[in-house]
């Protein structure tokens, strides 16, 4: 052993390649040992070692002598355990263990620590107990893999479903948010969105949304419904025929005292009757087939199959009898007046009962429900019958001999306002005309009315709350108050006191000037009243109430509670649907009292038969004033001037005439607002057009434009767009027009009507002569204005805007390098003081813009 170790010490260490080769040889030897058995294993190992030594010696001779001879190991001297384990002692620094591990070889080796080897999932585990065990283990591993794969798939699916649910909830929240902004409430009306799309002209989008399959499915469902309906009708007809046959059989059954022979003979007769009926039904069906088909057109006239109009049998009978033909609607009226229409009387009685039941249950709690019920009755019955029925019931409920509860009057007037807005304005007009006619009749005989009779008081209260809920305008109520004040007595004072107590503060709020005029008129009437009336306590109390309303002192009014009426107004607004609102009727007292003579102009399609002389005189007056009415009341010179200025639309012509004929800019502003124009750009166009065509700059147009800009932002945008149009078309303007435009913009910009950024459409990189002249005029007028604080505020507003970096740099460049040139300053012909002031302000503005940019 010492000899071997001595040689090994002299041997050179093996290289990596040689070590790997040696390791593979050891593996082969161990395999041979395993298959050779236990008897001759040592001999085979020794022979293998000798063969290995010989091969290594041959290979070493062939190579260059790079290293010393390898050490020769005698296998007889190596222990068996060391040989089987593949571990050989040597003096080498590196030794590579054999990775060959076998179950039977490990069993022969002495006990040692076994390291647990964790193999990755899916790697086949080697088994030596048999092929069946190995296959079972492989199946178990495969099942485990499939189970784990399914678990992963289920988890991923659940996660995906959860994510989709979260996204759907986010989409629903976003949709609800947008629906809320668009005021679409699905809970109120599910088909409202589709109806909105049809109203907005977007119904064609539904054709793109509905594909062919859905249309086909809908068509099939429609066909199935038709088929089911047809089968049901056939069954009903069959049931009717069977019932008739059973009734006939019951009638034809023989009595108990009849004999069987008689019953048999009767049965034969029944068979004969049945055959006769079948023949008759066949003949009737043939006659029906041969009969000409008659249809009604949209006008109610009967036409045959070829389209010819058939004569009316009633008209033929009347002509044959030599009588005058009476139209159907007049026949119905004559029959109703004569009392021959029992069916109409039954309808009116039933309608009266239904309306009375609804009105008896009317209260603030169920106001919406009762209003919807009466609206439904309006849809099912004629409006004439409904108006007459409701008028009769409301007069019975509210216009009694005793004083009516004020809350009850308010609830009924809210109902009228709802019907006026939801069904039609002619309903409110009908009730207003009825109540005003009653009021006029009571006022004419007011001196004979007893103080205990409260019918006029109740009627005045009804008219007051009709005004409070905006059924008619303030002018009519002022006329009614004037009619009461003209005939001062104890009853009229009581009615005036009732008006001031109920809606006095509302009158003062709606039109203070009209209320002041009315109050002065009433006070003058009181001053001229007789002494007996002046000493009346009711009159003194009315004067106190009038002064309290004048001074806006609500505490002096006894039992004054405006909250109930205000709550009812809010409830009315909430009850109205489909963008409906109460249309306020602007009718005068004379129009209502003479409606039977001159007609109801406030109702569309209303006609009348009045005095022909009055109609002729009215026609003559109309011919005389036709030019004035056609021209809107403007002078011919103004209209000719508007035509020359190319005011080619009615809106522009009216705006132009108002601007030219107004007393001042406030008067022009109010008159233009009363036109209720939807196009704000027309106002801006006309004002700028007039400003440009003046000989010299007129500040009137700038003040008027500033008034509109401060009134609504829509007008501010309209003036901005109109200014941009003029700046973009500046080559079409003359120098006086450019000066007027610069003066107009300078005044509006300094007053904060428009921002300085209105000039951002000017291309500073390619300034032509006219654009340069325009910018020079604007900037010089801005910088030399009197109020220095307004100048700096104008530029500061632009300096704070971070989106206008390029515009601010362009303004700085224009001011420093173009405006302050000696040549340009000489052209301006400024005084030395103005030149220094201009230089000073330009430097300050340049620093302001530069500082904010930093």
From Swiss-Prot:
Domain MIF4G, chain residue ranges per copy: 352-553
Domain spans labelled MI: 650-764
Any GO BP annotation: ribosomal small subunit biogenesis
Keyword Nucleus: yes
Top-level taxonomic group: Eukaryota
Biased composition, class Basic and acidic residues, residue ranges: 15-28, 135-156, 217-238, 290-306
Keyword hit for Nucleus: yes
Disulfide bonds: none
PROSITE patterns: MI (PS51366)
UniProt biased composition (Basic residues): 60-71
Subcellular location, record wording: Nucleus, Nucleolus
InterPro entries found in the cross-reference section: ARM-type_fold, CWC22_splicing_factor, Initiation_fac_eIF4g_MI, MIF4G-like_typ-3
Chain residue ranges for the region called Disordered: 1-38, 55-105, 120-161, 217-306
GO cellular component: nucleolus
One family name in Pfam for this protein: MA3
Acidic residues biased stretches: 88-105, 242-289
Keywords: Nucleus
GO MF entry, a single one: RNA binding
Family named by the database record: Belongs to the CWC22 family.
Protein name: Nucleolar MIF4G domain-containing protein 1 homolog
Species name: Drosophila melanogaster (Fruit fly)
């Amino acid at each position: 052993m010492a000899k071997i170790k001595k040689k090994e010490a002299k041997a050179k260490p093996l290289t990596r390649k040689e070590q790997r080769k040696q390791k593979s040889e050891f593996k082969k030897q161990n395999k041979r040992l395993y298959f050779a058995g236990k008897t001759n294993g040592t001999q085979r190992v020794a022979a293998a070692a000798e063969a290995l030594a010989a091969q290594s010696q041959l290979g070493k001779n062939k190579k260059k002598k790079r290293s010393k001879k390898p050490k020769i190991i005698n296998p007889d001297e190596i222990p068996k355990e060391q040989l089987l384990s593949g571990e050989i002692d040597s003096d080498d620094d590196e030794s590579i263990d054999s990775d060959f591990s076998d179950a039977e070889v490990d069993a022969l080796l002495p006990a040692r620590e076994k390291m647990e080897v964790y193999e990755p999932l899916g790697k086949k585990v080697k088994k030596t107990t048999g092929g069946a065990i190995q296959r079972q283990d492989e199946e178990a591993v495969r099942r485990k893999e499939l189970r784990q794969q399914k678990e992963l798939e289920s988890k991923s699916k659940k996660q995906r479903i959860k994510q989709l649910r979260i996204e759907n909830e986010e989409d629903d929240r976003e949709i609800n948010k947008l629906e809320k902004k668009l005021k679409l409430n699905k809970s109120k009306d599910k088909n409202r969105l589709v109806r909105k799309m049809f109203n907005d002209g977007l119904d064609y989008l539904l054709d793109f949304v509905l594909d062919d399959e859905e249309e086909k499915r809908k068509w099939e469902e429609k066909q199935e419904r038709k088929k089911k309906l047809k089968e049901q009708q056939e069954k009903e007809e069959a049931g009717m025929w069977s019932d008739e046959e059973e009734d006939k059989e019951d009638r034809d059954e023989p009595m108990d005292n009849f004999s069987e022979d008689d019953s048999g003979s009767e049965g034969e007769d029944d068979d004969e009757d049945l055959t006769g009926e079948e023949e008759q039904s066949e003949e009737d069906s043939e006659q029906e087939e041969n009969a000409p088909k008659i249809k009604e057109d949209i006008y109610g006239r009967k036409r045959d199959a070829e389209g010819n109009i058939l004569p009316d049998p009633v008209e033929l009978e009347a002509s044959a009898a030599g009588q005058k033909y009476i139209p159907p609607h007049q026949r119905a009226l004559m029959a109703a007046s004569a009392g021959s229409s029992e069916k109409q009387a039954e309808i009116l009685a039933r309608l009266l009962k239904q309306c009375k039941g609804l009105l008896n249950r009317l209260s603030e709690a169920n106001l919406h429900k009762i209003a919807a019920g009466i609206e439904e009755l309006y849809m099912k019955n004629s409006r004439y019958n409904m108006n007459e029925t409701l008028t009769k019931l409301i007069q019975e409920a509210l216009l009694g001999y005793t004083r009516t509860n004020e809350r009850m009057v308010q609830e009924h007037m809210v109902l009228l306002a709802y019907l006026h807005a939801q069904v039609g304005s002619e309903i409110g007009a009908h009730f207003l005309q009825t109540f005003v006619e009653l009021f006029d009749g009571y006022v004419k005989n007011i001196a004979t009315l007893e103080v205990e009779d409260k019918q006029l008081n109740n009627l005045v209260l009804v008219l007051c709350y009709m005004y409070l809920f905006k059924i008619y305008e303030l002018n009519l109520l002022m006329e009614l108050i004037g009619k009461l004040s003209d005939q001062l007595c104890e009853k009229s004072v009581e009615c005036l006191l009732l008006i001031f107590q109920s809606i006095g503060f509302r009158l003062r709020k709606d039109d203070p000037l009209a209320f002041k005029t009315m109050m002065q008129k009433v006070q003058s009437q009181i001053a001229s009243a007789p002494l007996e009336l002046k000493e009346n306590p009711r009159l003194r109390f009315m004067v106190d109430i009038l002064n309290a309303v004048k001074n806006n002192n609500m505490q002096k009014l006894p039992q004054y509670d405006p909250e109930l009426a205000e709550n009812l107004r809010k409830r009315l607004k909430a009850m109205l649907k489909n963008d409906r609102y109460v249309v306020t009727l602007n009718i005068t007292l004379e129009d209502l009292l003479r409606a039977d003579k001159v007609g109801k102009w406030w109702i569309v399609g209303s006609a009348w038969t009045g005095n022909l002389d009055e109609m002729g005189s009215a026609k003559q007056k109309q011919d005389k004033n036709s030019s004035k009415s056609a021209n809107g009341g403007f002078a011919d010179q103004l209209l000719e001037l508007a035509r020359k200025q190319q005011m080619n639309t009615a809106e522009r012509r009216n705006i132009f005439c108002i601007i030219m004929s107004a007393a001042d800019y406030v008067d022009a502003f109010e008159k233009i607002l009363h036109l209720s124009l939807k196009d704000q750009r027309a106002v801006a166009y006309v004002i700028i057009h007039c400003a440009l065509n003046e000989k010299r700059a007129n500040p009137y147009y700038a003040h008027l434009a500033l008034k509109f800009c401060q009134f609504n932002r829509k007008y501010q945008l309209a003036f901005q767009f109109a200014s941009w149009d003029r700046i973009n078309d500046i080559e079409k303007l003359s120098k006086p027009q450019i000066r007027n435009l610069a003066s107009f913009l300078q005044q509006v910009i300094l007053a904060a009507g428009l921002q300085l950024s209105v000039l951002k459409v000017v291309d500073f990189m390619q300034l032509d002569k006219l654009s340069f002249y325009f910018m020079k005029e604007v900037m010089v007028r801005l910088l030399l204005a009197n109020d220095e604080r307004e100048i700096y505020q104008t530029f500061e507003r632009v300096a704070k805007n971070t989106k206008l970096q390029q515009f601010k740099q362009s303004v700085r460049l224009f001011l420093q390098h173009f405006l302050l040139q000696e040549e340009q300053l000489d052209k301006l012909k400024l005084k030395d003081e103005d030149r220094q002031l201009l230089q000073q302000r330009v430097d300050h503005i340049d620093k302001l813009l530069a500082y904010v940019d930093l």
